[in-house]
Structure formats: structure tokens, C-alpha cells
Amino acid sequence: METEQIRDEDVLKWILGQRFRAAQKKKAIEIRKKMISAEHDGVDEPAGIKAMVEEMNARMKRQQARVDQAILRVMDIIEYLPEDSLEKEICEYRHIDMMSWRQIEIAVPMSRSQCNNRYNEAIRMLLQNARVREIAREEREKYEEYIQQKSEAKKWRKKMAEKKFGK
């Protein structure tokens, strides 16, 4: 398989994972808001705290809009798979229902490797569609930025670990 095809597959998997990442960010904002609210519970809240809570509420609404948009985008892409196919079912479980691979194995029922093979086949099937290929190519730059950020974060964590343990 050529490198370009592998990259398209990686980009498509990243696009399909947008719902999960958006939901995780929303969850993180909710946790921060709860922590701040708990710290100031029962205390007359200064204007600064109220403003911060209002800002967090606004961020949660924006993040929910991103989650909703990601769900629609994922559903639109998955629609290109054959209607009653196992590949479509696995993609829906993974990217719409956000099920773990263990949960998918049980729901289908198949082994993890069989589920993964079917999932990878679904990705290849999707990339046979011109519109899906176009979407993947349009998002490639954002995907590359995402990978670059992950790489930089990994290097930073490694550097901090080396400092901590005096290597």
C-alpha cells in the first residue's frame, strides 16, 4: 500500500475521532467548572468568580456545538458505507456511540482483531468514495498540525521526566 493511501487512512481516522476529542474537551471544561464552583460553594461569590463561571458556561456551549457538529460530520461520512454492513455498524459503535473496542467486541460479537480488520476495511471502503477522499485531503493540513503538537508535547514530557529523574 502506498504512503499516500496510509496517510489518507490516518487522516480519515482522525476526522472520525473528532466527536470523541470534542466530547473529551467538553468534559474537561465541565470538571473545571465543578471544581471552581465547589471551591466557592456557600461563599458570596466575587464578581470575578461569577464572570469566570459565566465564561466557562459559554465555553461549554461552544464546545457542545463542536460536539454536535462533529457528530453530524461523522454520520455524514459513515453514511457512505453499505447500509447493513458490519463495517458500518462497527464505525457507528466506535465513532458515534464512542464505544471502547472491548464493548464493540461484545456487541458485534467478534474478536478484537476481527473487529479491527473490519474497521480498517471500512476505512478503505470509505476512501474509495471521491467525496470522502476530498474531505480527507482538505483536512490533511489540520491533521499534520495535530500530529506536530502531539509530537512536541511528547518531547516536552520526556524532557520533564528526564529532569525529574536526573538523567
What are these regions (language model features)?
Residues M1-Y80, R124, Q128-K167:
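N-terminal interaction/assembly modules
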Residues Y80-K88:
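Short helix-coil-helix linker/hinge
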Residues K88-E89, S113:
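Short, solvent-exposed positions on alpha-helices
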Residues E92-R94:
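Short alpha-helical segment immediately N-terminal to, or the first helix within
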Residues D97-Q114:
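Helix-turn-helix DNA-binding module
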Residues P109-V132:
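DNA-recognition helix of helix-turn-helix
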